[in-house]
Amino acid sequence: MVSPRVRLAALALSVCAILCLGMHASAFPPKPDNPGDNASPEQMARYKAAVRHYINLITRQRYGKRALTPENWIYRDPAEERVTYGLDDYAMW
């Protein structure tokens, strides 16, 4: 027979997995709804603007660590990795 502690751990793990999957599903904005063939020009204009906005959100450029190439990971300069904080700057004092 399975102990209550194991059951509780399995339940906690499954709840965490469900929550993580739920968070991942909402990572992208929802696609705009097509107004159909009988839509008025105003509805079509709103739909096209919503599609443009959706495409701009989905295809926006991401900067930072994603822009690094494998060569930069291997052959990076250690001096560039030095982190400076605002209070450590001697010009402030």
Swiss-Prot record:
CDD domains: PAH. Gastrointestinal hormone and neuropeptide. The modification Tyrosine amide is found at Y63. GO terms for biological process: feeding behavior; neuropeptide signaling pathway. The gene is pyy. GO terms for molecular function: neuropeptide hormone activity; neuropeptide Y receptor binding. This is Peptide YY-like. Its main location: secreted. It is found in: Secreted.
